[in-house]
Amino acid sequence: MRYLFFLMVGVLASHAAAQSPKPAAENAKPIQDNSFLLEEAYNQEAAVVQHISALIFDRTIHTWLYAFTDEWPVNGQRHQLSVTIPLQNSVVGKSAALGDVALNYRLQLVGSGETRLAVAPRLTLLFPTAAKEIGRGNGGLGFQGALASSYMATPTLALHSNAGITVQPSVETGVGGSAALTDFNVGQSAIWLIHPRLNLMLEGMLTNAESFTGVGTNRTRSTGITVAPGFRWAYNFPSGLQIVPGLAFPIGFSANSGQRGVFLYLSFEHEMPGLRK
């Protein structure tokens, strides 16, 4: 489930812009946020916060990973902070436990959810809150950098591109020492806005992960591919609250071959008047 953990952190770390409260006449505006395996390049709008729950279950090996993310804008839309708290059951026979908590900062570098092109880099600090001795976590701090871009190819087709790197400087080797591991990921998605409140989604992610071979600090690399068809829909309320459920079916190829998952998603977005300047 290691590939699932980094996918979840990468996506939920800085997920997407919320739809701020709008008059009823504007409620039909197409949703742009709430991807699953990728992130869009839209920060939260000023004074709008987002609470995200995501659960992925691998039907082949009967493991699951849950993650809760809270996103908050900082003095407007340009800066955003968020925290991701994962709960995982990644080792057969072990009970669920806390994973490595992620603290994230993202900059709205170019554009926004209102422009055709948007770009947003992200920095993430992974805290070693997981228990290594029960098969979770890596025993040390981790760092993640990512770049997301979003492009509206047509009024009903959104394209999102991601690239990222995760560095873990001090991972326990299992033979009394530690060494660094580095992972890379790239991703692409296409979102079809078939209705103002219903989107069809096709997401793909390639992850190149480094691991120890089991003999000292010798390393090996594996490349896994995940493709996930899915859909999402939105409920908009007069108060400005937006609820977005979603469902996808991740399929693994290459190093992830044989993995078949079910991805459940639920987001709540609303305004916090106290954050208004």
Residue ranges and their predicted role:
Residues 1-4:
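Positively charged n-region of N-terminal signal peptides that target proteins for export
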Residues 13-15:
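N-terminal signal peptide c-region/cleavage motif recognized by signal peptidases
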Residues 19-277:
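Transmembrane beta-barrel domains of Gram-negative outer membranes and organellar outer membranes
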Residues 6-10:
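Small-residue packing motifs within transmembrane alpha-helices
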